[in-house]
Amino acid sequence: MARLIDQFERLPGIGPRTAQRLALHLLNQPQEQIHQFADALLAARTQVGQCQTCFHLSADPECEICRNPERRNGVICVVADSRDLLALERTREFHGRYHVLGGLISPMDGIGPELLRVTELVQRISNEEISEVILALTPSVEGDTTSLYLGRLLKPFCSVSRIAYGLPMGSELEYADEVTLSRALEGRRPV
Amino acid sequence: MARLIDQFERLPGIGPRTAQRLALHLLNQPQEQIHQFADALLAARTQVGQCQTCFHLSADPECEICRNPERRNGVICVVADSRDLLALERTREFHGRYHVLGGLISPMDGIGPELLRVTELVQRISNEEISEVILALTPSVEGDTTSLYLGRLLKPFCSVSRIAYGLPMGSELEYADEVTLSRALEGRRPV
């Protein structure tokens, strides 16, 4: 029991009390349910790998998005990780392909471009016919650094754009922080 | 005492308990302090009016921003109210002039452009030499409607732009709502 609680506690966002509650809940479930849980854990770990093209999570050598013939070729959206890719998919606004970098450049943490899937991205751009690369990276120092780096690197090959930073929908100017408001002013667009 | 508590309770964001605490606090202050408070209240109400040019709050016929010779002429930033103007001033990024509309177009609430200071804005644009109007309105249905209306109205006279809508600084793609993320994608800019 203590071992199970300990395992739950290692998960992000789960403290000792929640871990205990989850463990106790599972102990009250039928044997079969526990087996299914354990199986799902093992299967996920062994079967889910990375798409060999875009590096999104995938059980097959090529992920569903890369295989989908209805998605537009020629436009690649670059994201830091699969979570960001899934967030963009939820908008149903982007119909091109993706490339998962596997992180952001962060000199403070010793993460340089060589630790990310940058070479693979350049290779894709030289092999496929790419007209636009959209950088969808977080508005942070690391995101800015990575966007700047990739922008310089890729501009000779195709047009490079970056998602907009500014006021989020439904927000009030009055409560926006100054950096966001400055960026929104700076990034103004013709009506 | 009850009357004072009642007055405080009418203020936005102040409930009965806070109102009581404020009233009790004031009763413990020296007589002089209470007089200064009352004077400030009366003076604000009688002396603070609107700038005749931009309609920002001002004790004089022309506000400090309109009088300031160091601010750039030719660029007008249009805001809904003085609170939004003050938020933009805090960024120290905008050095032009302002125009306070006095609200946003809202057909649901029966607020049409004739109730806002639109005629005054058009007049300013035809009298002064204006090269750009920046619409700094909230990202909402009302803000969008007003931006669309003003965009069509003013485009024959000068270039009209709108502040950027997208991811706020320091936010995570993963937690952004879908509409904000869609707008950020749509509003992407060349790197």
UniProtKB/Swiss-Prot annotation, chains A, B:
What Pfam families has UniProt attached to this entry? RecR_C, RecR_HhH, RecR_ZnF, Toprim_4
Task: List residues of the Toprim domain.
Answer: 74-168
Gene Ontology biological-process annotations:
DNA recombination; DNA repair
- Record flagged with keyword Protease: no
Which keywords belong to this entry?
Answer: DNA damage, DNA recombination, DNA repair, Metal-binding, Zinc, Zinc-finger
Q: List the C4-type zinc finger ranges.
A: 51-66
This one is known as: Recombination protein RecR
